[in-house]
């Protein structure tokens, strides 16, 4: 079921991309009037481009050239508020074999992941990482709970989705959005805490 859902997400992104494409003649006219506005480099990396407000690959071998890019693409999309181009998503899923022990222990990859995890909109990017398989391959313990069901009154989603929603809930508490319902923990989260120590176990 998860594979079907993941493929559907890629297909929907592709259909939306095709729907948003202007007619060829109009596209050429706009390109002449506003050169360089449709495709440009992503701020912070030469390996990715912005393609119709979606992050895409500057070259087909960016992941093979530097496997850290499998994590970096998500952080850059998060920082620049970009959606994901379907071609990029498809290439990510085909490059999962590059996520090995060396990448899991890479300082830069771990730094980027922790920045993703502790950002305000972490759940959006974590969910996309999960859909492409990157999250489960990068954090092997998480990979074991992907698509796992627990049949009781407290679990309406798969365990992996519940974990991602827990990160979202923790972020809401930290922003003070649950002050009325959870005053004590809200005050604690506003104090001097190690955010990495708090967020990582929740995931």
Each language-model region and where it sits:
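Amphipathic alpha-helical
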Residues: 158-168, 173-174
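Catalytic-loop motifs flanking and including active-site residues across diverse enzymes
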Residues: 69, 162, 199
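His-Asp-centered metal-binding catalytic motifs of divalent-metal-dependent phosphohydrolases/nucleases
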Residues: 129, 166, 183-203
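Amphipathic, non-membrane alpha-helical segments in soluble helical-bundle scaffolds
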Residues: 63, 156, 160-163, 191-192
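Poly-acidic low-complexity segments
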Residues: 66, 85-87, 176, 190-198
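Histidine/acidic-rich helix-loop-helix segments that form or flank divalent-metal centers
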Residues: 148-156, 175-193
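Short amphipathic alpha-helical segments with coiled-coil-like heptad repeat character
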Residues: 137-140, 174-178
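Non-catalytic interface/linker regions that flank or bridge core catalytic/transmembrane domains
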Residues: 1-155
């Amino acid at each position: 079921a998860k594979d079907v859902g993941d493929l559907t997400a890629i297909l929907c992104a592709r259909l939306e991309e095709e729907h948003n494409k202007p007619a060829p003649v109009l596209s050429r006219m706009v390109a002449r009037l506003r050169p360089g506005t449709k495709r440009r480099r992503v701020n912070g990396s030469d390996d990715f481009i912005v393609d119709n407000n979606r992050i895409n690959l500057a070259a087909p071998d960016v992941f093979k050239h530097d496997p850290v890019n499998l994590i970096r693409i998500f952080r850059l999309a998060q920082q620049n508020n970009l959606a994901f181009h379907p071609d990029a998503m498809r290439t990510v899923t085909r490059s999962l074999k590059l996520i090995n022990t060396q990448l899991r222990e890479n300082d830069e990859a771990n730094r980027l992941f922790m920045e993703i995890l502790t950002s305000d909109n972490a759940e959006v990017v974590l969910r996309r990482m999960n859909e492409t398989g990157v999250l489960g391959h990068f954090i092997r313990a998480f990979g074991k709970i992907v698509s796992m069901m627990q049949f009781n009154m407290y679990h309406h989603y798969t365990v992996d989705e519940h974990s991602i929603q827990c990160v979202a809930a923790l972020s809401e508490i930290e922003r003070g959005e649950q002050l009325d319902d959870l005053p004590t923990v809200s005050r604690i989260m506003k104090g001097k805490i190690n955010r990495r120590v708090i967020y990582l176990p929740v995931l």
